[in-house]
């Protein structure tokens, strides 16, 4: 009986093991199947070169020789406070002074000092170099140091302030290593990029890498700049990298490193480059003509803010406001007037002043385009023949400032005060004091009792709510009418130096 029980237990155990074995076998098959499926999903080949998986060395090695350091020479008087002290020269000077031999410090030889400016890159074996305009702006002498430490003088072939690009030329007996532009339109957010340059002026040939963080960035680095499609990267870019190249993994230049965003002045992972597709045509025009000609409308413009729109009785901020029309310019000849709102240019909707400047710059010179404006809340279409900006440059009214600082207050003049701002009638005394031409009419700001204001003493107000004004009583009337109508502000057209701009005055 005992033996029978043992046999039964053995059979049960064997059966259990068989079942477990089958389950384990099935589980293993499922796991294997799932593993195979998982492996297949993740075994798709990545579109990255084998070399770049582990190192960029093979990519950057042939590129570094084409990247240059740019510097200039300043002459420092050896006796100036900022000059480095030469102990031997000081001893000689002390000896001469003891002998009562006068020293003419102005005749002491000046010591040449190399001042780093930025980076650049060679685009042709004959020595053509691309860099940023701001790197070489206001510099008389430009020096180039190659990767092998050879130093050569460079001459400026041409520059374009509106895109911050410049073309230099060095002469060399031997063909120079060079790099080529690629297609920045093919670049995608997340692509690897490599920056090579001369950070802080003394670290030439520095290579950094990162990815494209974004494309089409519109940043306000300069009011004149019309580039509105910067490439953003987290590759380390610092002071001194300006003008250097941004490469893709195909060793092509897809950007010109131009700016960084940093409250500290050093890299925090936000850098910007001019796309190669923007730079290439500019460089070609600089090679050919040494300059870039663009379209000109001949008007001063400013953005429409909510306060300005409210002052004009508009319900939105579509378009840009014409603050001044240049006499005999294309806009003047076509009939554009101060106070008009440009809403379309060549069938392209106008969003803001920078967009309009870009559109005008790209407009065909000496050809007619259609411009749609809003005047007295009615749409009009005007044909305008665009001219070259080499004749005169169009600027945003907010770019210019009153160069003449006036701090004294005006007293004993018929005046009224609104919002801590004193307005006075334009007397002959005020004309002379604030240098206002005889043919100008309006009222003038004589005092401001607040620290921050969009107005300045000496501003001439010629228009309020698009109505001409020549007496402060009109200001009082329009201000009180707006107050009764529960309007937030009235709109003043001011003249400041050679510029015009609309500025809202809050109704309180």
UniProtKB/Swiss-Prot annotation:
Name the Gene Ontology biological process terms. proteolysis
> Where are the annotated segments for Serine protease?
119-284
Q: Does the keyword Repeat apply?
A: yes
Superkingdom of this entry's organism?
A: Bacteria
Q: What is its EC number?
A: 3.4.21.107
Q: Which residues form the active site?
A: 134 (charge relay system), 164 (charge relay system), 242 (charge relay system)
Residue ranges annotated for the PDZ domain, each copy included? 286-377, 413-497
The function of this protein is:
Might be efficient in the degradation of transiently denatured and unfolded proteins which accumulate in the periplasm following stress conditions.
UniProt protein name = Probable periplasmic serine endoprotease DegP-like
């Amino acid at each position: 009986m005992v033996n029978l029980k043992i046999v039964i237990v053995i059979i049960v155990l064997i059966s259990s093991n068989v079942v477990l074995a089958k389950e384990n076998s099935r589980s293993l098959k499922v796991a294997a199947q799932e593993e195979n499926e998982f492996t297949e999903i993740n075994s798709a080949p990545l579109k990255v070169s084998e070399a770049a998986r582990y190192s960029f060395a093979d990519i950057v090695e042939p590129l570094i020789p084409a990247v240059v350091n740019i510097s200039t020479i300043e002459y420092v008087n050896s006796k100036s406070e900022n000059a480095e002290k030469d102990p031997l020269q000081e001893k000689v000077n002390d000896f001469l002074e003891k002998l009562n031999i006068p020293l003419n410090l102005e005749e002491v030889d000046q010591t040449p000092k190399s001042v780093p400016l930025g980076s650049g890159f060679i685009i042709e074996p004959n020595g053509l170099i691309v860099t940023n305009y701001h790197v070489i702006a206001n510099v008389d002498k430009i020096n180039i140091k190659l990767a092998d430490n050879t130093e050569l003088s460079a001459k400026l072939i041409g520059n374009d302030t509106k895109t911050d690009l410049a073309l230099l030329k060095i002469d060399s007996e031997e063909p120079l290593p060079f790099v080529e532009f690629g297609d920045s339109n093919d670049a995608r957010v997340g692509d690897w990029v490599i920056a090579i340059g001369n950070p802080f002026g003394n670290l030439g040939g520095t290579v950094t890498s990162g990815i494209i963080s974004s494309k089409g960035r519109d940043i306000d680095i300069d009011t004149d700049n019309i580039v509105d499609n910067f490439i953003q990267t987290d590759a380390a870019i610092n002071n001194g990298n300006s003008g250097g190249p941004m490469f893709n993994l195909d060793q092509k230049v897809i950007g010109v490193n131009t700016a960084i965003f940093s409250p500290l002045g050093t890299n925090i992972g936000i850098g910007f480059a001019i796309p190669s597709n923007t730079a290439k045509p500019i460089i070609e025009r600089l090679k050919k003509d040494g300059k870039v000609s663009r379209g000109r409308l001949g008007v001063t413009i400013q953005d429409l803010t909510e306060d300005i729109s409210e002052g004009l009785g508009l319900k939105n901020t579509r378009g840009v406001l014409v603050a001044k029309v240049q006499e005999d310019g294309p806009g003047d000849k076509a009939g554009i007037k101060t106070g008009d709102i440009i809403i379309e240019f060549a069938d392209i909707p106008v969003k803001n002043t920078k967009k309009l400047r870009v559109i005008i710059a790209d407009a065909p010179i000496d050809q007619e385009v259609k411009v749609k404006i809003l005047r007295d809340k009615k749409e009009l279409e005007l044909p305008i023949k665009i001219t070259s900006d080499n004749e005169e440059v169009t600027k945003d009214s907010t770019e210019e400032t009153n160069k003449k600082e006036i701090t004294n207050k005006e007293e004993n003049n018929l005046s009224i005060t609104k919002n801590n701002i004193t307005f006075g009638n334009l007397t002959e005394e005020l004309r002379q004091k604030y240098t206002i031409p005889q043919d100008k009419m309006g009222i003038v700001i004589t005092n401001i009792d607040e620290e921050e204001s969009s107005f300045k003493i000496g501003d001439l107000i010629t228009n309020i709510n698009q109505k001409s004004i020549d007496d402060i009583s009109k200001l009082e009337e329009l201000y009180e009418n707006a107050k009764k109508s529960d309007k937030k502000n009235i709109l003043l057209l001011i003249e400041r130096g050679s510029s015009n701009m609309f500025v809202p005055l809050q109704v309180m």
